[in-house]
Each structure stands twice: as C-alpha cells, then as structure tokens.
Amino acid sequence: MLLLILSLGACSEEKEGELCFVGDSLVAGWDVKDAFPTWIVRNDGVSGAKLEEIATWNLNYQDKNVVMLIGTNNLGGKLFNDATRQEFITDFVDEYKRTIEGLAPRRVFVISILPRNREIDN
C-alpha cells in the first residue's frame, strides 16, 4: 500500500487526475476518496468478486489510471493441491494479463493479494 501511495505521489504531473479502483471486497470497503483526496476517484470494488468476472462488468478504463486488488476469492483447492498448483498459477497469471489488456488502462497499479491461511482454505 505504501508503495502505491509513493508511486502516485511521484506522478506530480498527474495530480488531480483520475484513479479507478477495481477489485473485490478489499477494494469495495476502501474509502478511496479519503485516501486519495487530491484525485478524482472511482471505486468499482465488488464483494466476493473473482478475477474472471471483471471482464463481464463492461468497465471502460481506457487511458485512465487503474488500481487493481483482486484474486483472493480465486484461491482455493487447486492452488494447494501439488498436482494442480503449477497449472493454477499459470492460468491465473494469464487471466490477470488478459484482464488488464481488456481494461486498456493508461497505467495500472496491481496490489498483491494478501496471504491466505492454507489450513483454513481447505
């Protein structure tokens, strides 16, 4: 989070620009207007959202700055199964790339999903 804030602060020519936030409940519950008061912000966070659902939301981020935090709802059995882990990771990364390309942002800031407790998820 600190890295994101520092990165945005370094973009002085973009002050007062627009930031579009997309993600799951972590984004939906984030008071982005308070966190980024000098920016025009849009919060498209949806509780329970999965990465592959973003493409169905018909969002237009062309030439806008996008902050993404999504993916924790995608984690589960395949990631923790030794036989399917590598395939899951490869597919997940590919889906992330396709999603970003589909949004066509000017610039994208991807916030890493939070660690999950393996025992609880199973």
Regions found by a protein language model. Name each.
Residues 1-2:
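Sec-dependent signal peptide recognition
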Residues 34-40, 53-122:
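Alpha-helical cap/lid subdomain in secreted, periplasmic
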Residues 5-65:
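Serine-esterase "nucleophile elbow" of acetyl-processing enzymes
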